[in-house]
Regions:
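Flexible hinge/capping segments at coil-to-helix
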Residues: 32-70, 155-158
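Hydrophobic hinge/microswitch elements
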Residues: 11, 15-20, 25-26, 76-130
């Protein structure tokens, strides 16, 4: 995440002439040139298809969950997901069997395979995916809206920031 912080921060500083208006990311760049606000927060669950073996286990353990084959969704070409970083901190690792780059396809993959997906509760509910709780403490998923401080007083920027913030609030319902 340090490298990403550096890249996003550098990118926004380079583009401080209204070329880049917003970034939404779980990482807040460390820079005096950047402002941010939290727009999304949700807990993680483990999604599966309707008749998956995991749905038959009452109160699945972390080992029950980690024994499954997992789908990893990330727009980044490589690297760990936030959930993997947190699992690694407590000595656990997922068995990632498939990686895809967008969440739009993830529900179809989960509904038609034995794979499971660690993702947010709101995503599971919005896509009508059955899920089980993760029986260990994992920090909440947080996303931040990030912008260059030079855009702070711009009326169009304020309007767009408000639209983005409301869209994320609607997504959590």
């Amino acid at each position: 995440y340090e490298m990403l912080r550096s890249l996003v921060g550098s990118e926004m500083c380079i583009r401080d002439r209204n070329n880049l208006d917003f970034v939404v990311d779980p990482v807040i760049p460390r820079s005096d040139e950047i402002n941010s606000m939290k727009v999304f927060e949700d807990d993680f669950v483990v999604m599966h298809r309707e008749d998956h073996d995991l749905s038959k286990v009452k109160n699945p353990s972390i080992d029950d969950i980690l024994d499954q084959k997992h789908l990893h969704v990330s727009g980044r070409k490589r690297g760990l997901h936030l959930i993997d970083v947190e699992l690694d901190k407590v000595g656990y690792r997922r068995k990632v069997a498939l990686r895809c780059q967008h969440f739009l396809i993830a529900p179809r993959i989960i509904q038609s395979t034995d794979l499971v997906l660690m993702g947010t509760r709101s995503f599971a509910k919005r896509n009508d995916l059955p899920f089980v709780e993760i029986p260990i403490e994992i920090p909440l998923m947080e996303y931040f809206l990030i912008w260059h401080k030079n855009d702070e007083g711009d009326g169009g920027h304020i309007w767009m920031k408000d639209l983005i913030e409301r869209a994320f609030k609607d997504a959590q319902r």
